[in-house]
Regions:
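RNase H-like (RuvC/DEDD) metal-dependent nuclease/polynucleotide-processing core
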Residues: 1-190
Length: 190
């Protein structure tokens, strides 16, 4: 969005409670320009009254890539869903946010346990082992791999198995792209 504020992000933070900081503010659309961090940060402060986090800045190449694909003719053939891993884990955990930080050993185990309700544990272990052997840690940490797996599980759900934020409707950004976060209907709510 032009201002970096999205109702779906606010709603996700509310649902995540103590894990709400995992939904960090998206950068405003101006950040898609190929500028330095300092230039983007200053422009964002001038336009929106807030800067851009380093975490968001480092995601910009992937955001640009996704934006280009969503705005291409290929997007007509795809059913795109935005999701958030912590919201997915929380939902698969009975709408209870994860207890431990995903970067810790306990948090990693906790997320694998929740995933094992939807993917056989041996499959999870094989996938993680193969990924860790083939992808440099500097490019993808183990917690990011588990995040990708939970997002893959959600992508396979049909519409009856998921809900979207914000509740009661969908926002669109200035170029017509949907601003929504899809997540599994919490376990026990189906």
């Amino acid at each position: 969005s032009n201002d970096g504020f999205r109702a779906c992000d606010r709603a996700a933070r509310q649902l995540l409670g103590k894990r709400s900081s995992s939904v960090f503010p998206v950068p405003p659309r101006l950040a898609l320009a190929p500028l330095t961090y300092e230039e983007i940060n200053l422009a964002s402060k001038a336009q929106c009254g807030k800067g851009v986090s380093k975490q968001a800045f480092y995601l910009l190449p992937k955001i640009r890539e996704t934006e280009a694909l969503l705005r291409s003719s290929y997007s007509d053939d795809l059913d795109w869903l935005e999701t958030h891993p912590e919201l997915c884990f929380s939902s698969f955990n009975g709408a209870m946010p994860m207890e431990d930080n995903k970067k810790t050993d306990a948090g990693f185990r906790e997320r694998k346990t929740v995933l094992a309700r939807h993917i056989p544990a041996r499959t999870i272990e094989r996938l993680l082992r193969d990924l860790m052997a083939s992808v440099p840690r500097a490019q993808c940490a183990r917690d990011d791999m588990v995040d990708a797996l939970v997002c893959g599980v959600v992508a396979r759900l049909d519409a009856a198995g998921r809900d979207c934020l914000p509740p009661g409707g969908q926002e669109f950004d200035e170029v017509g792209l949907p601003m929504r976060i899809c997540y599994p209907i919490p376990t026990g709510s189906q």
